[in-house]
Amino acid sequence: MARSQQEASIAQIMASRTGTDPADWFLVFKARYGMQVAFEEIYAEMGAGEVATQLLTCCTAVDPILVAGLVPRYCEVSFDTAMIDSEALDASGELRAVVAQHTYGIVDDAATARLAQRAHDAGALLVEDCAHCVGRMAKDESGEPLADISFHSFGIEKMLHTLLGGAV
């Protein structure tokens, strides 16, 4: 994929902050549009099903699930992490993805690892919502990202002084 100099620069910055490869970063007009494309691909590859998410979220994080033809399954939130409680997660049925939302910028690697394990054991993907902590991701002990897909928002109300944008 051909990138402009500015796109390559942002991909390099995101990669350096997260310990990932710049080639793995894709810029989008809004993070929710990147989420929509990812959920549409999940639907195309895995078929109809559910995405585990939480009520403590924004409608812009749920709309892409619905637009892609998937169904949100609202889950219990952990008091300690403000994300889906991995112990309470019902991973049965037609689960296609689990959203690890780092609410308030809380990135708990151990809790995310447990959530990733539950998702993967169910044959689902772990989708990481880093809208509140752009440039940070949950990682395993070796420093590798735990999520299969990670979204970062550059929206006006987020951490960066931009009007629009996001990265997948």
Q: Where are the predicted features?
A:
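Conserved N-terminal alpha-helix of the aminotransferase class I/II PLP-enzyme fold
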Residues: 1-33, 41, 56
